């Protein structure tokens, strides 16, 4: 496998820490050891997160093309767009963000706080669009790029989650390589990795990276899209493309992509009671915050799987904390009493 042949622009602090979740593990019976790899602490750029790791491989391409404007898309409370805005500010580039109405949640301040507030503070041109949730290529995003061209600029396209970008899976191949180095220091290997999946390139990169040591199917994706067929297809397609890029040396099989669909409800961006319980439990036992759109759902999945005995006794499970905490303020009504 050859990830090193791709240029990388450093946007993160370095390897993200692995934190034992001792109190949560004990609360759930102590038979499974839970750990968190803190991608939410990976950068000093506006809270960082998993997209910042991905952008390290996109930015060299943007600079090589002479782009002056990063153009991205997401929902109103998109973590992706906030991270793109931060990187643009850091590099002295312009930024145009298309923010679509992906979540059926009504709150008078939803489009004024959290991620979107931070993006505006960092100077991004934020454009609200009424279109609903979709993980694919969007006309509104293509229109935004054309508007930059018409104004004499040179846009660089960064799709939702970086996922439909040809290089979008590379960052989390690097995640897997990083975990292997940390495992050597820890003296053990993780039996499972739990990760939230929506647009797919985070899990896709992990699948490729862990396929190198036979653990592709030990990456358990927790669907948060509530459109799991599309998410599974996108993960698989991106993983196969990424495997070719890094010369993995073996094909990605359908069985390599594990996507658990039990925890996405009631729909994208809205938490159910199990998700809310998981968010509060992790916060109160570990001081680790998760959000109701993504990480709360993957935390719910991991906790429920432990309770159901779906991990063998003695298993060591690594929870990939991808970020997302800035969105919590947009859900203040849900958490008004904690």
Curated annotation (Swiss-Prot):
GO terms for biological process: 1-aminocyclopropane-1-carboxylate metabolic process; amine catabolic process. Catalyzes a cyclopropane ring-opening reaction, the irreversible conversion of 1-aminocyclopropane-1-carboxylate (ACC) to ammonia and alpha-ketobutyrate. Allows growth on ACC as a nitrogen source. Gene3D superfamilies: 3.40.50.1100. This is 1-aminocyclopropane-1-carboxylate deaminase. Belongs to the ACC deaminase/D-cysteine desulfhydrase family. One of its GO terms (molecular function) is 1-aminocyclopropane-1-carboxylate deaminase activity. It catalyses: 1-aminocyclopropane-1-carboxylate + H2O = 2-oxobutanoate + NH4(+). Pfam families: PALP (PF00291). The active site is at residue 78. Its EC number is 3.5.99.7.
């Amino acid at each position: 496998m050859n990830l090193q042949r791709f240029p990388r622009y450093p946007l993160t602090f370095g390897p993200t820490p692995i934190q034992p979740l001792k109190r949560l593990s004990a609360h759930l019976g102590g038979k499974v050891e839970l750990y968190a790899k803190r991608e939410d602490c990976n950068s000093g750029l506006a809270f960082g997160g998993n997209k910042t790791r991905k952008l390290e491989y996109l930015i060299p391409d943007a600079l090589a093309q002479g782009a002056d404007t990063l153009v991205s898309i997401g929902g109103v409370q998109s973590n992706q767009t906030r991270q793109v805005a931060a990187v643009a500010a850091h590099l002295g580039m312009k930024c145009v963000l298309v923010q679509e109405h992906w979540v059926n949640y009504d709150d008078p301040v939803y489009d004024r706080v959290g991620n979107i507030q931070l993006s505006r503070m960092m100077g991004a041109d934020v454009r609200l669009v009424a279109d609903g949730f979709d993980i694919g290529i969007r006309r509104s995003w293509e229109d935004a790029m054309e508007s930059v061209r018409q104004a004499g600029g040179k846009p660089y396209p960064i799709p939702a989650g970086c996922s439909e970008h040809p290089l979008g899976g590379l960052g989390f191949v690097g995640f897997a390589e990083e975990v292997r180095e940390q495992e050597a220091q820890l003296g053990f290997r993780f039996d499972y990795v739990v990760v939230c999946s929506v647009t797919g390139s985070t899990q896709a990169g992990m699948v490729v990276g862990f396929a190198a040591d036979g653990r592709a199917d030990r990456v358990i994706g927790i669907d948060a899209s509530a459109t799991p067929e599309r998410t599974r297809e996108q993960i698989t397609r991106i993983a196969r493309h990424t495997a070719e890029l890094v010369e993995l040396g073996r094909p990605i099989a359908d069985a390599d992509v594990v996507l658990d669909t039990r925890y996405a409800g009631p729909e994208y961006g809205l938490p159910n009671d199990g998700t809310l319980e998981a968010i509060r439990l992790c916060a109160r036992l570990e001081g680790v915050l998760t959000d109701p759109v993504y990480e709360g759902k993957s935390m719910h999945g991991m906790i429920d799987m432990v309770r159901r005995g779906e991990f063998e006794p003695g298993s060591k499970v690594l929870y990939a904390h991808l970020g997302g905490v800035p969105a919590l303020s947009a859900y203040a009504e849900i958490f008004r009493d904690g």
